[in-house]
């Protein structure tokens, strides 16, 4: 997230750099589930990176329905993305699709609920959906989580705003994507704070008892 402003079609140097970094992380963490996302909406590039680096999943923007993002209009990509995944032999790479994505306006689909968006992503063969708040570090709506869980059978991930204080609101999620809270002072651009990570995971362990 350090190359703002993002472009809709990032250059090949971005894909190359991300592939090298992803491969290095995979080598360091051979048994941990790993994924990649490339902004902005560079989902085919992410699939290629994941295949080359031996990753397990990507996070995809604009999988179903169009929306207006900071970078402009992002159109649905499910058909092209799944065909590309098959074409390069990457069908083992799972696709977790953002729904009603953060940092975006959804007036174009104001008559489509978040649950309906999730159902469409499931119909279009997403392996899971990602529910977020309105921006990085902003919490998702727990009521929307319940609605989406009721609407689909695929995994539902919460992808923003999870903290030590509010994680109990998201225990029904199948997975959590945590960035900001794990950084120093809880700010997304800072370095990871091992103490915050340790404290959070200890709290999760207690909740699981």
Where do the language-model regions lie?
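Long hydrophobic alpha-helical segments typical of transmembrane helices together
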Residues: 164-204
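Glycine-rich, proline-tolerant flexible connector loops at the mouths of alpha/beta enzymes
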Residues: 1-17, 65-70, 126-140, 185-187
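Conserved beta-strand positions in the central sheet of alpha/beta enzyme cores
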Residues: 58-59, 130, 177
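Conserved anion-binding
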Residues: 44-125
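Catalytic cores of alpha/beta
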Residues: 41-54, 117, 148-178
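Internal alpha/beta core interface subdomains
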Residues: 115-132, 138-155
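Alpha-helix-loop-beta-strand connector modules within alpha/beta enzyme cores
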Residues: 6-36, 75-97, 140-163, 195-209
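Active-site beta-loop-alpha junctions enriched in small/polar residues
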Residues: 1, 37-43, 63-65, 98-104, ...
């Amino acid at each position: 997230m350090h190359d703002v402003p993002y472009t809709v079609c990032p250059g090949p140097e971005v894909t190359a750099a991300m592939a090298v970094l992803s491969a290095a992380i995979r080598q360091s963490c051979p048994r941990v589930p790993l994924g990649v996302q490339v902004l902005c909406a560079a989902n085919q590039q992410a699939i290629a990176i994941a295949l080359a680096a031996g990753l397990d999943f990507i996070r995809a923007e604009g999988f179903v329905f169009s929306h207006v993002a900071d970078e402009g209009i992002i159109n649905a990509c499910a058909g092209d993305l799944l065909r590309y995944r098959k074409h390069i032999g990457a069908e083992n790479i799972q696709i977790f699709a953002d729904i009603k994505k953060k940092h975006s306006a959804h007036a174009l689909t104001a008559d489509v609920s978040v649950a309906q968006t999730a159902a469409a992503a499931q119909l279009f063969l997403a392996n899971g959906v990602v529910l977020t708040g309105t921006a990085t570090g902003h919490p998702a709506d727990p009521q929307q989580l319940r609605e989406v869980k009721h609407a689909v059978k695929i995994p539902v991930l919460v992808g923003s705003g999870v903290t030590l204080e509010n994680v109990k609101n998201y225990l029904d999620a199948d997975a959590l994507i945590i960035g900001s809270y794990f950084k120093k002072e809880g700010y997304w651009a800072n370095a990871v704070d091992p103490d915050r990570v340790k404290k959070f995971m200890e709290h999760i362990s207690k909740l699981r008892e």
